[in-house]
């Protein structure tokens, strides 16, 4: 099991790389994360939902995503409330107090049953399981009935490797401090340390490594270098090194708005990778609406709390900036929650995402959305119609809203839909062709669809060519090669 001294220490990446290394050896290996809290998710083959990071790790193993890889997924809708997804299905939304409960006796106390059920099924099907912890095992206030870190490791008698991010500074305090806050049995469970994202001369670090091993009695199993431009599916929130695309000098500007509860920002990885695109995220809580000036394409992403994020967007003045953007010839796209925002009205009569009520939307498209408790989870393929010829497109849907298009569409966005539902349920385009929205996450992953959207938005450069899947494979191979070089694989293999 890989645990970390903090969030974003490198647990997801380390598990993915080790999964690929074991899979290369022809071993049957699978990823496992008992509990994940994230707004980036993926749809499984059987119509369930898991964390995006576990879908990435499954790909590293050569597997399709499965709900057992992430039995508990928490999707925050506010600072204190989250949707609880068990074995791929949304069961309820709970306040934090109800999840943890008084003296640790809330829902969390029984969630371990679902976790162990998935773990035992996987154990029967695979030779090796690589388990990822969550956050830090040393969160004192979360120790009671823990299912994400040491609580799980102790329940299944699993050895633990502790990883820390040296790039943030204070790596020795992170490791020694975490160890000091664990019980004796938990300390004994940690078999070694991995230091992640190191830049510089390893010889200058060596005295610190020698001290760490002498002080703790535990080996340093490797120092992983900082991998520049490693772009793999992010687990959750954007961090600074993920936010902008590569500086290619491109002049075609794409801007994606980021609201407080943005979800599935991995949709935009293909745009960040595109050499002809000047890509950036704009955090609406801190950026000025004037930052949209000069943008060729603006995208509204998904949201876990659409009405609250819409209100934030309006309060910060981005509604007026979007109208100005379109008025002066810019193109506008909404994905999932962003699609709902482009409509006329969003109704939440039962309080699915937040307080029951109704919100006026941005009125760019003739849509009305009603949020419902039942969630749509589907892998979808079809044809996207933006230019003279339709192009193949595939992706996935994750949403609670049912959107109705008012009137007859003069231009359907999707020509073919393989779910048996009307194509208009997937998305629509404005009569003037300047704005479109859809429920399809991953719409940019297919090179032909990405090229079609960029051409529609006015891009006249070269086509992309490489799919996100091909790029992901290249990055996983690069990651695995790096781990093979910089980790003590003999010691690691002895733990399996």
From Swiss-Prot:
Residues 251-449 form the GATase cobBQ-type domain. The active site is at residues 336, 441. InterPro entries: Class_I_gatase-like (IPR029062), CobQ/CobB/MinD/ParA_Nub-bd_dom (IPR002586), CobQ_GATase1 (IPR033949), CobQ_N (IPR047045), CobQ_synth (IPR004459), GATase_3 (IPR011698), P-loop_NTPase (IPR027417). One of its GO terms (molecular function) is ABC-type vitamin B12 transporter activity. PROSITE patterns: GATASE_COBBQ. GO terms for biological process: cobalamin biosynthetic process. Pathway: Cofactor biosynthesis; adenosylcobalamin biosynthesis. Keywords: Cobalamin biosynthesis, Glutamine amidotransferase. Disulfide bonds: none annotated. It holds the Pfam family GATase_3. Belongs to the CobB/CobQ family. CobQ subfamily. Catalyzes amidations at positions B, D, E, and G on adenosylcobyrinic A,C-diamide. NH(2) groups are provided by glutamine, and one molecule of ATP is hydrogenolyzed for each amidation. This is Cobyric acid synthase. It comes from Shewanella amazonensis (strain ATCC BAA-1098 / SB2B).
């Amino acid at each position: 099991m890989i645990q970390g001294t903090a969030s974003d220490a490198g647990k997801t990446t380390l598990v993915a790389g080790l999964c690929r290394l074991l899979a290369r050896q022809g071993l049957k290996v699978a990823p496992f994360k008992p509990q994940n809290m994230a707004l980036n998710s993926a749809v499984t083959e059987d119509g369930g939902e898991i964390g995006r990071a576990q879908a990435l790790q499954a790909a590293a193993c050569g597997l399709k995503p499965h709900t057992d890889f992430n039995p508990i997924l928490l999707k925050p809708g506010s600072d204190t409330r989250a949707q609880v997804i068990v074995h791929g299905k949304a069961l309820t939304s709970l306040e934090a107090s109800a999840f943890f409960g008084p003296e640790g006796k809330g829902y969390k106390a029984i969630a371990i049953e679902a976790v162990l059920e998935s773990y035992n099924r996987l154990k029967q099907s695979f030779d090796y399981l690589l388990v990822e912890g969550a956050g830090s095992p040393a969160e004192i206030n979360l120790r009671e009935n823990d299912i994400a870190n040491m609580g799980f490791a102790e329940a299944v008698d699993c050895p633990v490797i502790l990883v820390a991010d040296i790039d943030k500074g204070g790596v020795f305090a992170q490791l020694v401090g975490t160890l000091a806050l664990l019980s004796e049995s938990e300390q004994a469970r940690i078999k070694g340390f991995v230091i992640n994202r190191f830049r510089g001369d390893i010889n200058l670090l060596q005295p610190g490594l020698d001290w760490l091993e002498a002080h703790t009695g535990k080996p340093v199993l490797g120092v992983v270098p900082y991998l520049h431009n490693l772009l793999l599916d992010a687990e959750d929130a954007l961090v600074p090194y993920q936010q902008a695309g590569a500086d290619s000098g491109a002049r075609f500007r794409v801007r994606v708005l980021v609201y407080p509860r943005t979800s599935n920002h991995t949709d935009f990885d293909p745009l960040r990778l595109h050499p002809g695109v000047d890509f950036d995220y704009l955090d609406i809580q801190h950026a000025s609406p004037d930052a949209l000036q000069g943008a060729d394409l603006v995208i509204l992403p998904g949201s876990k709390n659409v009405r609250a994020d819409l209100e934030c967007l309006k309060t910060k003045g981005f509604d007026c900036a979007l109208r100005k953007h379109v008025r002066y010839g810019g193109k506008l796209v909404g994905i999932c929650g962003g699609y709902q925002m482009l409509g006329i009205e969003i109704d939440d009569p039962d309080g699915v995402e937040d307080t029951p009520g109704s919100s006026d939307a941005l009125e760019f498209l003739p849509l009305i959305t009603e949020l419902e408790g039942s969630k749509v989870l589907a892998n979808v393929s079809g044809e996207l119609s933006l230019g003279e010829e339709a192009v193949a497109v595939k992706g996935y849907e994750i949403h609670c809203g049912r959107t109705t298009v008012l009137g007859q569409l003069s231009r359907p966005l999707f020509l073919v839909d393989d779910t048996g539902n009307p194509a208009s349920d997937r998305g629509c385009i404005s009569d003037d062709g300047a704005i479109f929205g859809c429920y399809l996450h991953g719409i940019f992953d297919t090179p032909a669809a990405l090229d079609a959207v960029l051409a529609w938005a006015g891009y006249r450069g070269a086509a992309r060519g490489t799919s996100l899947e091909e790029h992901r494979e290249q990055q996983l191979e690069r990651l695995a090669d790096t781990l093979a070089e910089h980790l003590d694989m003999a010691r690691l293999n002895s733990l399996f």
